[in-house]
Each structure stands twice: as structure tokens, then as C-alpha cells.
């Protein structure tokens, strides 16, 4: 089991400031069409983000570089050689110029063997936080699956064993895939959490500024980008009561975001300045409730009848006043309060604030709910018009709170 601090770290939203290089071969393959390449990369990033959402990671594209003149280092078919060259180029050239958490080389070269991608495992926030993916198929979703897979390796996730499952499949970390992968398996999530707690990568905890993002804003990707006030996902998935998921704008001030649950609760309204509903607030203590049968106390409406029903069941109600007069005796079970270990009898006006008496409906008995010390009337219970129980006495509701 994890410590609370470990759980906080795992639950924290994480952001990968992501830099993509498109090499010269890929540029030529797409007929020197930079706008088309950009759209393709933006679509890939969006697809990758959808896959990483359950892991609480957002991929923020903070740089896209297309090598339209020539490659800045030699891109070779040997995947491991190109990965090493890319790592060195990022370290010496890219990082001094543009800080990033992770960089990807998207290449048009045909990598040796069956490989379409390669990554350093468990390397985020280090000098080895890079991976290479071959743009091997016109289907964007297939290449985006490979991007997700290789970035998964950077995040300490291993290939899935035969016992790892995800429904619907196929799983992202399968060694061989023919169809676009759907989601991470339970094995992948376990690997990722173990990696996080072992290596504690810190660079993914800071949230990039919306002005740093180079991809166009997408309403519904859970990330507040330029022109958006909030982003809580799709309208079906949105959990933020004061964010309009369709427009990514705050709901107007005064829109009800949480209805009153009962008459001792208050409705909450959006402020117009936040995506979240304000903290749940309660009706003030002493406010009449349940058709004047009680007065609100800490968000509840305590009455003697409700106490009897809660303890004994729906066939019971509060006893007639004659039963409560027994509380003036001050003996074993019938008293108002304790002082220094002594049971203090009730004054006549306080009898309904002492021991609780219940009656089965249509009978005249003075029943005491089973408890060796007797059950006392709850604080805040109505004991007369404008009167409530406080510390075993029946006092004016105005002075009680």
C-alpha cells in the first residue's frame, strides 16, 4: 500500500512538454507541404492525448520543427544509432534553445527490420527522454499508436505479456500490432505507477502556459488553451459543473450548479469566474425545517420523532410529554445532563432535552431505545416553539447559535 504522499503524487495531473522533429525525408514524402504535415502531427498529438488521459497525463506540444532544408544530424536506418544521435542532438543543440520534457523524431526513413519505433525505457526528465517513430503508414491512427507505445516505454512501461488484457483491445503495449491500439492494459498502468514512484520524475508536474502550446486549441481535450476559460472534456465526460463543455467557457454567474438536497442545505451558484461549483454550504443553524417541525442544526433537521424512527423503525414516534416528565427524577436513565459524574435531573422546561422516549404507534407506552446509558435528545432538537436543546437545556433558538 502507498503512503498518502505517494498517492498524492500518483493522482497529480501530469504534463509532458513535448517537442516534435519531422525529418527531411518525411518532409519530401509529403511533397514539401508544411501545412499538411502540421495537421498530421496535430491529429497524432490529439490521438496520443486520448490514450494517455486515463493515466492523468497531458501531452502539450510546445514545439514542432520541420527540417525542410536538410537533417541536422544523420538519420540512419539503424534505429538504435539514430536514437543515440537524436539524444545527443537534443542534449547539445535543442535543450539550450528550447526546454522540453521529451522529444520525438518523426522520420520518413525505413528503419531496419520490423521496427517502426524505438525509445529509451524509463527515461522521462533525463538526457535520454527521446524516442524515434517511423511515419510508416498513411493511416494517422496507426502511427499515433506507435507514438503512444514508444512514449509508454519512456514512461517505464514494458511490453504486455499474454496475461495482460484490456477491453476493448488491442492493448497499446503489445509487442506486435496490426490494428490501432485502443488503451493501456492493467499491466501497463502498474508498470507506469511503479516507474513514477521509483524514479519520481519532477519535470512532468509543472503545467505549461497555454501560450507555450503550438498546436491549435481543441475544446474537449482537458487542457485550457488559448481562447479557452476552462476545458473539462467532452460534454458527456465533463465533471465541472460551471464549465460549458461545448464552448470551453465558464457558465454565467448565478447558474445553479448544485441544488439544495433538503431544507437545511443551500443551493450553490456558479460565480462566472471558475469552472468549479463553490463549496457545499448549509442553511444557517436555527432556520425552520420540515414544515416547522424542527430547526436546522449543522445541515440536519433534528426532531425527536426522526430520532425514534432512526433508532427503532418507521412504526415508532415520539412519546407524549408525560413520558418525558420522568426526566425530572434524575435517576439511572432519566436525567438531562451529567456534571462531574452526577446525573442532573431536568427542570420542567427542559424535559424534552433529556432522555429520549419513544412510543409504538397506536400505543401509550414510554419506550426507551436500547442503550445502557440511555439515548439523549440530539443537540439542536426542537423542544418548543422557538426553542431548541443545547447542553441538556431547552433554550431560545436565537441565543443558542
Curated annotation (Swiss-Prot):
Subcellular location: Secreted
Cofactor(s) the protein needs: Zn(2+)
Cofactor note: Binds 1 zinc ion per subunit.
EC annotation from Swiss-Prot or TrEMBL: 3.4.24.-
Active site positions, chain numbering: 150
Keywords tagged on the record: Calcium, Disulfide bond, Glycoprotein, Hemostasis impairing toxin, Hydrolase, Metal-binding, Metalloprotease, Platelet aggregation inhibiting toxin, Protease, Secreted, Toxin, Zinc
Domain Disintegrin: 216-285
Binding site for Ca(2+) 2: 218, 221, 223, 225, 228, 231
Family in the record: Belongs to the venom metalloproteinase (M12B) family. P-III subfamily. P-IIIa sub-subfamily.
Stated name of the protein: Hemorrhagic metalloproteinase-disintegrin-like kaouthiagin
Organism: Naja kaouthia
Amino acid at each position: 500500500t502507498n503512503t498518502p504522499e505517494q498517492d498524492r503524487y500518483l493522482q497529480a495531473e501530469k504534463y509532458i512538454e513535448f517537442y516534435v522533429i519531422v525529418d527531411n525525408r518525411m518532409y519530401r514524402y509529403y511533397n514539401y507541404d508544411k501545412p499538411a504535415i502540421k495537421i498530421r502531427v496535430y491529429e497524432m498529438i490529439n490521438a496520443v492525448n486520448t490514450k494517455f488521459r486515463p493515466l492523468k497525463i497531458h501531452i502539450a506540444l510546445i514545439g514542432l520543427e520541420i527540417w525542410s532544408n536538410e537533417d541536422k544530424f544523420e538519420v540512419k536506418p539503424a534505429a538504435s544509432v539514430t536514437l543515440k544521435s537524436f539524444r545527443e542532438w537534443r542534449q547539445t543543440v535543442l535543450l539550450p534553445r528550447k526546454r522540453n520534457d521529451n522529444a520525438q523524431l518523426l522520420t520518413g526513413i525505413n528503419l531496419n527490420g520490423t521496427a517502426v519505433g524505438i525509445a529509451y525505457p524509463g527515461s522521462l526528465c533525463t538526457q535520454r527522454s527521446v524516442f524515434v517513430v517511423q511515419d510508416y503508414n498513411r493511416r494517422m491512427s496507426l502511427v499515433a499508436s506507435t507514438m503512444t507505445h514508444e512514449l509508454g516505454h519512456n514512461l517505464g512501461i514494458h511490453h504486455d505479456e499474454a496475461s495482460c488484457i484490456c477491453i476493448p483491445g488491442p492493448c497499446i503495449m503489445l509487442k506486435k500490432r496490426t490494428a490501432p491500439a485502443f488503451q493501456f492494459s492493467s499491466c501497463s498502468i502498474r508498470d507506469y505507477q511503479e516507474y513514477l514512484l521509483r524514479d519520481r520524475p519532477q519535470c512532468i508536474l509543472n503545467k505549461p502556459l497555454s501560450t507555450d502550446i503550438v498546436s491549435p486549441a481543441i475544446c474537449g481535450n482537458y487542457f485550457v488553451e488559448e481562447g479557452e476559460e476552462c476545458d473539462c472534456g467532452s460534454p458527456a465526460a465533463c465533471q465541472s459543473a460551471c464549465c460549458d463543455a461545448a464552448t470551453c467557457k465558464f457558465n454565467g454567474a448565478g447558474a445553479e450548479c448544485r441544488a439544495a438536497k433538503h431544507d437545511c442545505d443551500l443551493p450553490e451558484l456558479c460565480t462566472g469566474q471558475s469552472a468549479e461549483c463553490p463549496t457545499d454550504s448549509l442553511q444557517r443553524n436555527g432556520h425552520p425545517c420540515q414544515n416547522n417541525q424542527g430547526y436546522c442544526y449543522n445541515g440536519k433537521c433534528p426532531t425527536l420523532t426522526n430520532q425514534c424512527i432512526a433508532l427503532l423503525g418507521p412504526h415508532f414516534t415520539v412519546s407524549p410529554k408525560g413520558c418525558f416528565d420522568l426526566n425530572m427524577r434524575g435517576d439511572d436513565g432519566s436525567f438531562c445532563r451529567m456534571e462531574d459524574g452526577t446525573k442532573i435531573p431536568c427542570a420542567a422546561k427542559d424535559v424534552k432535552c433529556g432522555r429520549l422516549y419513544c412510543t409504538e404507534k397506536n400505543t401509550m407506552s414510554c419506550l426507551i431505545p436500547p442503550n445502557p446509558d440511555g439515548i439523549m435528545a440530539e443537540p439542536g432538537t426542537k423542544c418548543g416553539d422557538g426553542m431548541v436543546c443545547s447542553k441538556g437545556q431547552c433554550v431560545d433558538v436565537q441565543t443558542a447559535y
